Each structure stands twice: as C-alpha cells, then as structure tokens.
Amino acid sequence: MVKLSIVLTPQFLSHDQSQFTKELQQHVKSVTCPCEYLRKVINSLAVYRHRETDFGVGVRDHPGQHGKTPSPQKLDNLIIIIIGFLRRYTFNILFCTSCLCVSFLKTIFWSRNGHDGSMDVQQRAWRSNRSRQKGLRSICMHTKKRVSSFRGNKIGLKDVITLRRHVETKVRAKIRKRKVTTKINRHDKINGKRKTARKQKMFQRAQELRRRAEDYHKCKIPPSARKPLCNWVRMAAAEHRHSSGLPYWLYLTAETLKNRMGRQPPPPTQQHSITDNSLSLKTPPECLLTPLPPSVDDNIKECPLAPLPPSPLPPSVDDNLKECLFVPLPPSPLPPSVDDNLKECLFVPLPPSPLPPSVDDNLKTPPLATQEAEVEKPPKPKRWRVDEVEQSPKPKRQREAEAQQLPKPKRRRLSKLRTRHCTQAWAIRINP
C-alpha cells in the first residue's frame, strides 16, 4: 500500500474548499494511468477530519469554523506528490494526446488523394486505365468506372469511399440530366413541333441543310452545273445531224452535262418508221432532265423534251404508202392480147386467185405481185369445190298439199354456174 503525504500551501488554502476539490479532480481525470487510490484521497480531502493519519496530514483547528482544515505544510506535500506522479507518466500522456489530436484532425480534413469530386483525380485515374495495360482492376464507387491499380499507384480505402454529399450531388445531377434529355428527345422528333418560334425555325433550317446534303451526295453535281447561266438552247436538227422535218424543235441542254449524258439514239430507219412513227428513246421520261453517262459519238449533249417525227425513207417494195384509190395505175407491159388497154380500178374487189386451200382463200384483195401475175397470164378456169358452189337454201318441210301446189326448184349444172360466174366477173372488170 502506497502512502502519500500531501502538503497544502497557503495559496491553496485561500481558495474555497469545494473549488479546490474540483480542480484536483479535473487534473487527475486527465491522467490515463490507474491511480484510483490517489483519486480517493483527493475526494476525501474535503471531508477529512482526523489528525495524524497515514498521509501525515496535519490539521489545525481554527476557532469559528465547523470543520477542520489541513495545515499549509501538508498541502505543499500533496502538490509535490502530484507533480512527481505527472513527471513519471509524461510520455504516456503526450502520446495519447497526440493520437487523439491526429484522429480528430483526420475526421475534419478529408484526404486529398481520394475521389472527393475533383475532376483532376478522376481524369488521372481514367487516363491511366486507358493508356496502361495490365494490373488489378477495381470499380470506383464514385465514378462507377474500372480503375487499374499499377505498381506505384496504390489505391486505398480513402480513394474508393467518398463522402455522402458528393454522391448525392452526382445522383441529383444525373437525374436532372436524364429528365432534360427525355424532354428534349420528346420534342425533337421529325414532326418538327416546337414550343417556340425560334426553335421551330432552327429545326426547319436543320432539316433543309440535311436534305441539301443528301441531294448533293446523291447527284454529285459540280458547282458550275448549279449556275443558271450555264444552260442554253440549241436546235434539234443540228444536234441529231439528220433532217427530221422539224428543224426548229428546241432542246434544253447544259454545257456542263457533256460527261453526264448518255448515248443518243440513232436516226430512225425503215424498220423504226414502219413499227413506230416516233423516235424511240431508251431514257425513261422521268430521267430526261438528269445527267447520263458520257457519249462517244456526240460532244454536244442534249436533253430531248419531245420525240422527233421520222425522216423520209428511200423507195422500196415494202413501203406502206397510202395511195388514193381514185387514181388509176399505169399500164404494165403485157403480151399482145385483148387486155392491153384495160385500166384497173381498185374500187371493186377481184375474184380470188388460184391458191392452195388455206385460211387466206376468202381474201378479197390479193397482194400486188399476184395482181401483176394475173395480168400477164390469162386466168385459167378454176375447178370449183362442192362447198364453194352457191347452194340454194333447202326448202322447208311443208305439208303434202302445200308441196304439190308449189313448183319444184330446177336443178342446175355445175358447169353452167361456173361459166356464168366467170362471165359476170370479167364483164365487170372489162367494163368499169
């Protein structure tokens, strides 16, 4: 058991007893070493009434006081004991105090190396993650991105965990950005509906520029072709190099479209004139004004607006020329016969020519070559078929009494019918 002698100086005796006890208690509580006995002694100083105790504290009686107070010598001894105790545990006290101060400062001042919302730290971490390869990967709780930890780049707990206020700020900003984006996308559709006239005008201008860019990339027309002074007019006859009958038929052409136009169709021939009187164009009507591939034969490119009529053809046997039937044909050279001076008129159809049995038997107008052959050679009597003979209609079945009253039809011979028909036909031909 440790015995302590406390000496109270006159300086402490001058203070109030309760105040003195409180000061000693606060001073002893700041010490972190086990000294319960010393605390009990200090707490019992206020109520200590015995003389000559183990502490050796001498108390003098003062008249007029209810209690007894220790002597100044004993108070001085008590202070000396306390000072000696504090000197012995000075290092422990300083160490504990420094630890408490450091922990307190760490809670106040946050780490500068952590993701505390500074963009330089985030950019540095993201740049190192992209530029360098290999390393352990972890996900940052603040940026929600992968962060690589390389040699020399140590990532601690302070670099990952962030303050709650920064996280809340980031979340609020993200929600606001999402709302704004959704709102803009809802009104930025192709229909062009805007809340204000300024936004509507901007949208229309953007649409116009977009369409112009699409047309430019599709057509790829050089800048000179877009000038209005480059278009000029030329004549169709000079361009096609043939007489079309309409030399002043206009064509709209452009000088810059020389390498863009296609090959022009050749002049119309006999076959083209027979089949179609108009100039057949390979270019569809919707592409007449658009540039076509370059042509080899013609350096002057044209864009026809209307088809050309056919050009006149050389005389031929197969011409489908329409002749007036009122004009008689010139006499053809025939052997001396009775029909030298006969003139033929095409008003009346000729009898059928001797042809093999076919579908063309009933033709009333034979071709020109057949007519000439008939004129040169005298017609031979044709053997009529039984089917071709004009048969009288069969009499209706009548009663016997009525049949006796009517005369019976006479039967005619085939030779008489044939001779009579030929005579009538040649009579019509000779005597027009």
Swiss-Prot record:
Residues 408-420 have a biased composition (Basic residues). Residues 270-280 have a biased composition (Polar residues). InterPro entries: NPIP, NPIP_N. Pfam families: NPIP. Transmembrane segments: none annotated. Coiled coil: none annotated. Residues 260-280, 353-420 are annotated as: Disordered. Residues 374-402 have a biased composition (Basic and acidic residues). It comes from the Eukaryota. Belongs to the NPIP family. PANTHER family: NUCLEAR PORE COMPLEX INTERACTING PROTEIN, NUCLEAR PORE COMPLEX-INTERACTING PROTEIN FAMILY MEMBER B15-RELATED. This is Nuclear pore complex-interacting protein family member B9.
